[in-house]
Amino acid sequence: MADILLLEPGYSNKYPPIGLMKISYFHKYIHHDYVRFAKGELPEAFREKKWDRVYVTTLFTFEWERTKKALEYALSVVKDPHQVYTGGILATLMPELIAENFPTVKNNTGLLNRKGTLGLEHEECVDTMTLDYGILDDIADQYVYPAHDAYFTYMTRGCGMKCQFCAVQTLEPEYIPFISITESIKRVDEQFGSKKDLLLMDNNVLRSPHFDEIIDEIKALGFQKGATYINPKTGKSVQRFVDFNQGLDAFLLTPHKAERLGELALRPARIAFDHIEDAETYKKAIRLCARSGITHMSNYLLYNGEDFTGKGHSYHADTPDDLYERMRISMDLCEELTAELNHKVAIFSFPMRYIPLSDLKRGFVGARWNAKYLRALQRMLIPTQGKGVSSHSFFEADFGKSSEEFVMYLAMPEEHLGWRGHFAKRKNESDAEMAERKKTWDENQQYLGEWKRRFLALGDDKDKFISYIGNNSYSVERYLEIKESELKKLYLHYFTIPTLLKSFLLENETEKNIIVEYITQEFPLMYERMIRYVAEGKLPYSMLEGAFRTLGATFAQSVLQHIDYTGTEEPFVVNSLIKVQKKARMSIFKFEYIQGYFLYKRVGALDRKSTNAIVDAIKNLDEGKTRSILADKFEKFKAKMIAQATENEVGAA
């Protein structure tokens, strides 16, 4: 009896590691070994234990860093470094990466569908083993897979369409048209309890000449249309669903196959819409499904791609306009079919970013995209919370009413994207809270209006401006590369406030004057927000130096007018102003007097009248009046300090 550790890297994923579950079943129920499953690392109780064998699964290539960490961990807890095994998607697609970095690790590429793959006694075909759902209990306190109450299985293997961007032809090169799952489902029921849903991982089930047999078997297993399931924990009856998780090929969907799919508790029917060139084929497939009684459908919309071949076709690299039109087609189909069939038809769209199979860091940018657009789209998808785009009103609010508006949103500063929409009262919000939020909202609308006005006025300079923001990195250095003053002003909207403050350090007065003129005269709200940020924040004095030298008393007075004088603790910015004035060798105001004001206030040496007078003097940079008030109240301040010290001594005694 051996000690076996199954390890999944510490990434977030929706589905449990099916390969490890099969390996666990073999070791636990056929080899009678002790098996433990961990995600990332083992709990503290197992830290000192050494294992006879460790299996590490792999997923996507862009998860290489987490995978590498898991393999390093495996080698640290195994007795013999030659007894670490890996496999899965990354390990199959990039075996040289495993070999180069982990020469002692045994890499099982492809499927475990041959006798003796793991080199163990009694090993036949691990790929057909029952899944050991029991291993999920090992990490129940640490991680729960979003999809866990389901049978995970295959009824076919492979695909055969040979799409250039797809890994299936490498992972599953041979097409197997039919795999019965009845016995494996029965074993799961007997050993681990029945499951609510049936999640089929087939890559191209519609290609199978045994399609009718597959549908019949699924129905016989209790997943016919309208099927229900008694939840063992609650005793309540709930709907069951079938999910061909890897999608249905629109090119292979016929009226007969759609009717047969309509006999299942299918939700959703996943139909890929990878290229705008496939629009008519996609629309035909959606209509067939809807007219066959399937009410919930979804699609993956591949974007950020290159020129591809697949399914006997050639495809051009997609554009942002293409993505918008594909989403729009699905929204229009929802309305069309809902009206035609007189019941709700839902189509959820999931934009899916293309990443080359060899990309280890998820940083690929397609030929017709740029980093700015990709980041903006990611931000725009946040409200969907991974549930897809299905509402027509939400679609137009978030993605625009036209492809031109969509592309404009992609070019918009990321922070601005969150400012769009309508103002509405929030639940349990007081009138005062709403008024304060409305004030900020109104300011944000001014920002949006100013940015939009300038962006729409770009004309022939639009492509040039997009080239300046395309890398999604905004700097003073890039600002200097821009020649046109109007483009420079628009570019300022992409600056963070720290970057805007840094721009005041420019030695070129002409370049600096463009900034000063724009934020103080043309769009003073930008200056106002910069000042508030300085007054309310905790910025080091070095960040204020450029603005202090350039704007002098104007900057200092603006900051002092936004300081909160109602408390007893001096704001952080006061000390920064003292330091920056000393560094700049300038004499605008004796900011130490402000420290004196807060010290006097702390001990109660200032009445309301003198408080108002000194605050007014400070805000107007009236150093003489400030000094005079502090001098007048000095004796009272001294008496308060003595009384406070005496009180403290008595208390200590």
Identify the residue ranges that each predicted region occupies.
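A general structural detector for well-ordered alpha-helical segments in enzyme core domains, enriched
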Residues: 23, 66-74, 184, 214-218, ...
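Radical SAM enzyme core and accessory elements
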Residues: 3-6, 28, 32-37, 47-48, ...
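Conserved C-terminal portion of the radical SAM core fold
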Residues: 55, 83, 198, 265-270, ...
